[in-house]
């Protein structure tokens, strides 16, 4: 059994670590609330934009934009949103497993994949497993701006425009609540119909009026749509990251408390054994006299 002094030193080390994890938990909780506010502010715009684009995809357009046309799939692209920092539980690895599973499903059909990575953790992982990373962005901090994401988005849109990829997906964590975040894969291109758009179009033959003309409007609008969906994915992933980190740090703090209790019991036993030995030596010495 370890000596009382050594055990006392271990207890002190665990207590110091516990203070750090508790502080990190509180910081993550504060950042999560701010991320939730940012996510809530951008979500209505992203959802409305998606609904409008869904109606356009089912409408009777004079000009059929390439982003609305299905085509034979020879190669797919993924915009993968990960984190720049760790200590957030299984948030990243669960997302990466989802991407790999989807890539394998396409590979079984003879379709290859390109990756544009947002976040250093994703870049590190997919570089290590041999993924074809064609663009990356990292170091966006706690307040990501759309300008930080333009690089990877532009690369993937250009690849789609030139026919080098035939489908484009965004992969990110959807924030459900503080305790639950779920990896999701959402198709960006070609534009999928909105969830309720098909039923609306079946009941009515209405369409939008375009000014000055459909091509000029759609060329800009559809790119803004993709950018808005990517930005929304990033802010939701950031909220998910902070929530996962808060939960992970709370678990670490609680585990530290349990470990301290166990070490305290061991320390008490060691101290008791030491006292018993000292008493035995005193009694033995007295008997010898």
Curated annotation (Swiss-Prot):
MF GO annotations: ATP binding; proton-transporting ATP synthase activity, rotational mechanism
One GO term of the biological process aspect: proton motive force-driven plasma membrane ATP synthesis
Record-linked Pfam families: ATP-synt (PF00231)
Cellular component per GO, a single term: plasma membrane
Assigned keywords, A-Z: ATP synthesis, Cell inner membrane, Cell membrane, CF(1), Hydrogen ion transport, Ion transport, Membrane, Transport
CDD domains given in the database record: F1-ATPase_gamma
S-S pairs: none
Membrane disposition: Peripheral membrane protein
Record localization: Cell inner membrane
Keyword Membrane appears in the UniProt entry: yes
Similarity section: Belongs to the ATPase gamma chain family.
Role played: Produces ATP from ADP in the presence of a proton gradient across the membrane. The gamma chain is believed to be important in regulating ATPase activity and the flow of protons through the CF(0) complex.
Subunit structure as annotated in this protein's UniProt entry: F-type ATPases have 2 components, CF(1) - the catalytic core - and CF(0) - the membrane proton channel. CF(1) has five subunits: alpha(3), beta(3), gamma(1), delta(1), epsilon(1). CF(0) has three main subunits: a, b and c.
Protein name as it appears in the record: ATP synthase gamma chain
């Amino acid at each position: 059994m370890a000596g009382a002094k050594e055990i006392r030193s271990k207890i002190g080390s665990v207590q110091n670590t516990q203070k750090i994890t508790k502080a990190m938990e509180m910081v993550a909780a504060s950042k999560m609330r701010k991320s939730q506010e940012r996510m809530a502010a951008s979500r209505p715009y992203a959802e409305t934009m998606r609904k409008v684009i869904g109606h356009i995809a089912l409408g009777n357009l004079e000009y059929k934009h390439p982003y609305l046309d299905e085509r034979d799939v020879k190669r797919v692209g993924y915009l993968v949103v990960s984190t720049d920092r760790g200590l957030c539980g299984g948030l990243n690895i669960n997302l990466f497993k989802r991407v790999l599973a989807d890539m394998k499903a396409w590979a079984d059909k003879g379709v290859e994949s390109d990756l544009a990575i947002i976040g250093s953790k994703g870049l590190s992982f997919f570089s290590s497993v041999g993924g074809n990373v064609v663009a990356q962005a990292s170091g966006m901090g706690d307040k990501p701006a759309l300008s930080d994401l333009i690089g990877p988005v532009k690369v993937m849109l250009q690849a789609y425009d030139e026919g080098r990829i035939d489908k484009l997906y965004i992969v990110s964590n959807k924030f459900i609540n503080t305790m639950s975040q779920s990896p999701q894969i959402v198709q960006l291109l070609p534009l999928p119909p909105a969830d309720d758009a098909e039923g609306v179009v079946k009941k009515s033959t209405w369409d939008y009026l375009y000014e000055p003309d459909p091509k000029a409007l759609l060329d800009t609008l559809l790119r803004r749509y993709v950018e808005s969906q990517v930005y929304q994915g990033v802010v939701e992933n950031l909220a998910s990251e902070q929530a996962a980190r808060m939960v992970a740090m709370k678990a670490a703090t609680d585990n530290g408390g349990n470990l301290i209790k166990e070490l305290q019991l061991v320390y008490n036993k060691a101290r008791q054994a030491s006292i018993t030995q000292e008493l035995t030596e005193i009694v033995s010495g007295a008997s010898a006299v």
